[in-house]
């Protein structure tokens, strides 16, 4: 049995006869009975500290590691700390650092440009002689998430731009150039068993629909027939070998998906009862640049724009002989992403790993040097930024931009200092607005219902197997503004889940009616 936790949505699927249960950072029901969250007002600082101490020293945490830091933005005083200098796995709390870096180095209004290059403009008849190259720079907003859930609109701006440039037919090839980023298509230390799932999608400067295909399974109308499968967006990029069966009512749902790494064939096994309401999943695609131009060709054809040649891609490993100096080419069309303020929010609220890594690379692409990967350059720039923010050296160690790597380490001290710094930053309001709001949206939409924390906690979640974290802002019952970092590692409890341990602490802060400089 292999189980893991990631921020996002709940998946339970069979894979090569193992069950992978992904219990996510949404507040979904747990196997154990839910713990009752605190409701009583806490009138004094002494009472708050007493309540917090009882919980952080609870015997159920004896084998775990818990780090806590709570500071008032209004007075600057530390209300409580426990193991605040200990390095712990942050999971997706790492995204706070990536989001802050992107806003600082690029600015809230920054947009990512995707360019269409050719040797010359199309002629009067709309014929583009030779190849058309789409040069990506990491725009991830070509996705249904940014278009009201409509997959058909994701590539529409790019197609419209080409049509507006007068392109009706292309005599050469359609080339997807993803060479803007230098390095492997995954974040450092992402593990192999993450790569077959949507949250481990390949990273590319040409990204379309989060580099995944959404899958919907329903039982067939006739017993014994294969389960029906539909995909969004519609595509032939993935080949599905369907070996599933529709079984009698009341049977057990047992579906297995397997796509060998770097291959585009997906094997489907198992069964679905005839009375099953259906099941959804998502499968990451291999070779995202190839996926991009494949889908673009289809979108162009629907607009009546034809391509006579083949589909090709170009990456950072291209030889000197095949590299292109685009300054000598004509940019016949381009699109720009949504502003960075929106990109950061769409990364933070649903806790999107691909977006986080792409934002780190976006920063790194502007500073990377020969012999250095774009990721290495981005991480180096992050360390410079953290030094400027007053974060002590050695207290924030990230290996990639999302927190999916278990090699990422942070201290509660570092995260609280980052939050305090961002409150003084020109992009303070943008950064704060990117955080999930308890009981309202993102990965906190279903958490803290009926408690004082609802709508008063704005925080980034983090969840991996045996790891739970929450870091952000809370407004107390006395309207004092606090920032906090709660990090729980190596916790295996089942009676009370790790998420519930963290939530109890956050609700105590929301219930605090005293003052940080009071008794």
Annotated model-derived regions:
Residues 81-101:
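Short active-site loop at a secondary-structure junction
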Residues 58-82, 312:
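A short, well-structured edge-of-sheet supersecondary motif
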Residues 79-81, 350, 360-519:
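Small-residue-rich helix-loop
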Residues 30-36:
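Signal peptide processing junction and immediate N-terminal pro/mature segment
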